[in-house]
Amino acid sequence: MARTLFTSESVTEGHPDKVADQISDAILDAIMELDPYGRVAAETIVTTGLVLVAGEITTNCYVDIPRLVRSTIEDIGYTRAKYGFDAETCAVLTSLDEQSGDIALGVDRAFEAKKGEMDDKELDAIGAGDQGMMFGYASNETAVLMPMPIYLASKMAERLGEVRKEGIIPYLRPDGKTQVTVEYEDYKPLRVTTVVVSAQHHPEVSSATIEKDIIEHVIKAVIPPEMIDAHTIFYVNPTGRFVIGGPQGDSGLTGRKIIVDTYGGMARHGGGAFSGKDPTKVDRSASYMLRYVAKNIVAAGLAERCEIQVAYAIGVANPLSINVNTFGTGKISDDKIIELIKKNFDLRPAAIIRDLDLRRPIYRKTAAYGHFGREDAEFTWERTDKADTLREQAGL
């Protein structure tokens, strides 16, 4: 088989787009904690000295959004005015309305039965919050069943944050990006060919020091040694300088890192972002559910790779279509896998929210370093508790 290269990138929590994502999800979490049935669609823009939060929020609780914005920025690490963006001094503007009544018509019905178990009729009565198509994916090339390029890129971005906050590399600042190229043969990862790390830093630190520290404490701390060889190329701050960064260097906007958030381009994406959206928005909840489904299919050994697409209509509970692609790696047919999905997974929006327990303040931590492939108990869509059942029903 011919060998191929595939590349994915990730960014740190201090990247301007990720600052915006985290603010949006911090607002969502604050509302979910006080009002689990609140409706939230919070969009954030950040730029030099300014944060603007806009969108639609319907809730019976009060959230101090400016205070929440500042505490989120402080947690990320923008705490000095000379960074061009500072938790204490930045301006915070808000422009928020209630959710459109026309949209609510398709979602609200039967939410008066929100306490206790909903019967099948009530589950059918709660429709999707919008039309659209969503994808889920899993691959057996890593232990967490994620594509290797995005998994390693996300882990390196997370490691950049760790070495900064723990003082291991004390001169780093919050912004940063990572990129990993993996060589494949017959869809099996062979080696890492190239690693790129760009890390914001104090102006008086030499390029040689930065390169040495990043290779030692970030790249080699994350990339498995067996995936690196004498021909692997490391690029550390290839422009030679990365002092101006974060919202001072570029404006940031919620929802602009959807490939970083998911599978690094290895799987398709329906186009809908996640952050700032409550779980009635199927852009988010259905994507989480499809990751859960795909991961269980791969964990069960039904396929080595699996991509699933579903589509919804606003106000309609059941998906309009389900498509499965195992890329020729399936142990049973894709049609048979679709039958197993319909038998074992309820893809109606209210059932997704129920089965993944999505009405909780769990979203801020998803907003940096990827929504998938994370080993955290609160990421319920990463469970593989259906794998044994799927394997048995498939006759494997």
From Swiss-Prot:
It catalyses: L-methionine + ATP + H2O = S-adenosyl-L-methionine + phosphate + diphosphate. Its main location: cytoplasm. L-methionine binds at residues 56, 99, 250, 281. Residues 99-109 are annotated as: Flexible loop. It is an enzyme of class 2 (transferase). Pfam families: S-AdoMet_synt_C (PF02773), S-AdoMet_synt_M (PF02772), S-AdoMet_synt_N (PF00438). Keywords: ATP-binding, Cytoplasm, Magnesium, Metal-binding, Nucleotide-binding, One-carbon metabolism, Potassium, Transferase. One of its GO terms (cellular component) is cytoplasm. The keyword Cytoplasm applies. Binds 2 divalent ions per subunit. ATP binds at residues 15, 175-177, 241-242, 250, 256-257, 273, 277. Mg(2+) binds at residue 17. Its EC number is 2.5.1.6. One of its GO terms (molecular function) is methionine adenosyltransferase activity. GO terms for biological process: one-carbon metabolic process; S-adenosylmethionine biosynthetic process. Its cofactor is Mg(2+); K(+). Pathway: Amino-acid biosynthesis; S-adenosyl-L-methionine biosynthesis; S-adenosyl-L-methionine from L-methionine: step 1/1. It is found in: Cytoplasm. K(+) binds at residue 43. NCBIfam families: metK (TIGR01034). Belongs to the AdoMet synthase family. Homotetramer; dimer of dimers. This is S-adenosylmethionine synthase.
